[in-house]
């Protein structure tokens, strides 16, 4: 059994592959002002197993990043010493520490029961409220339409996020009470889908591999070994294969209409005679090693 297989208390996740993948930069949003990303997943640790290297990179580049977890992972253990309430409190604290390590600004927990998440009207309203309040240009979430077998909560949060983004966040009369509260409509520019079977967007997060290891190990209730050096060694060894890199994380990039902030900046640039260069979204023909599903143990 490999170290990575032995590290986790239940099933071992993938950390992303992409040894030969072309590496993409996060697409420019057409402005030089604040850039905000909101990562939304079902359980504490879901974001970090698949995307912690990229999150650390974007935070270091000046992005404001928020985490949103639909549940607190209150069923994710085999340890009989935990009650659901104790486990939820533990995992919330672990997630806050992992987010601190990476530079995430704030973590939100929506409090839904682990294992029973549904894309309800209530959940959609909460997500729309977050989008209209914090104005992310980019949203990162699970690919809810991935065809292979995976956790039901992962599928449900991916679907819920898409339904909240379009058309509900854009159109004022969805959840019209927000308008009365001063929360206007909002348009998100990009969606990055984790765990997609056909990723087209690859981030070289090699300089942040140690931060990713620290974020993973912050989820202490979910790992059975805390050997940081060995974890880093194993993650690096995956990238030393021919043509490889130390840490590449893969996403399916979906472009939506430009956000209001980007539209305003793009219009100003057009008036000044400035145009944005066209950039490739990545490597659609990346090898299978870049397409491995990324899923946390819980």
PLM ranges: what are they?
Residues 1-134, 270-272, 288:
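Active-site rim/loop-helix segments in enzyme catalytic domains that contact anionic ligands
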Residues 2-38, 118-298:
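Metal-dependent de-N-acetylase/amidase catalytic core
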